[in-house]
Structure formats: C-alpha cells, structure tokens
C-alpha cells in the first residue's frame, strides 16, 4: 500500500519501534506529551514541542496533513510511525492517536535525541 501524501520520508521499522518506546518512556518518567492532532498542532504553533510523532494510517489523511509543513516552518523535528493504535497505546490512552507532541522529554532525553538524529540523517539522504 502506498504511503499517504503527507509522509515525506521513509522511517525504518526499528526506528518506529524506538519512537513508540520513547513515547512510553517520556510518559513513565515524568515527561509531558500532548495527544491528538489539535493538542499537537497547538504545541507546535506555540513552539513547545520537542518532537512530533505522526501516524501513517490516519483516515482521512487531511487530519494530519498540515503537521509536517507546520513542523518544518517552526523547525520542530517530526517522525512517522505506522500505527495510530500503537501510538495511542504508547501515549497511555485507550484510543488511537493520529499524532502526539513531546513537550518535556522526562527521562527519555537520550532516546529522543537519538530519534531526532536518525530522522535528520534520513531526511538529509532523502533530499
């Protein structure tokens, strides 16, 4: 199945798994995340987000299509994950999450920094 139009670069499965782990770790170590596209959008617009995670299986895709552009504009790193269901679980909610924003990394700083670095390398290679 082709990726939705808002997916600007390919994220390897092992990196996506690391992202889910990082979101869980942020939540479990006193960090702060915003769940859902409205909350994520506000966090990006206010410049509070350290990392934005966007699910690839959002329907309709227009729900999150503005996030990559907004993140680029605000110079906030973002990454894609394949499953909104898994993203919701990692964020500690019972329902799926189209996107989440990390506001405070808590005890997951190393993991978050590693993810941001990997994303920068992927984006540099994919032009």
Swiss-Prot record:
Subcellular location, record wording: Cytoplasm
Gene Ontology cellular component annotations, sorted alphabetically: cytoplasm; ribonucleoprotein complex; ribosome
Keyword vocabulary terms for this entry: Cytoplasm, Ribonucleoprotein, Ribosomal protein, RNA-binding, rRNA-binding, tRNA processing
GO biological process: ribosome biogenesis; translation; tRNA 5'-leader removal
Pfam family of the protein (one): Ribosomal_L7Ae
Source domain of life: Archaea
KW tRNA processing (keyword) present: yes
InterPro entries according to UniProt: eL8/uL1-like (IPR050257), Ribosomal_eL30-like_sf (IPR029064), Ribosomal_eL8-like_CS (IPR004037), Ribosomal_eL8/eL30/eS12/Gad45 (IPR004038), Ribosomal_eL8/Nhp2 (IPR018492), Ribosomal_eL8_arc (IPR022481)
Gene Ontology molecular function: any one: ribonuclease P activity
NCBIfam families: eL8_ribo (TIGR03677)
Family note: Belongs to the eukaryotic ribosomal protein eL8 family.
Assembly mode: Part of the 50S ribosomal subunit. Probably part of the RNase P complex.
Role, per record: Multifunctional RNA-binding protein that recognizes the K-turn motif in ribosomal RNA, the RNA component of RNase P, box H/ACA, box C/D and box C'/D' sRNAs.
PANTHER family named among the record's database cross-references: RIBOSOMAL PROTEIN L7AE FAMILY MEMBER
Identification of the protein by name: Large ribosomal subunit protein eL8
Organism placement in taxonomy: Archaea, Thermoproteota, Thermoprotei, Desulfurococcales, Desulfurococcaceae
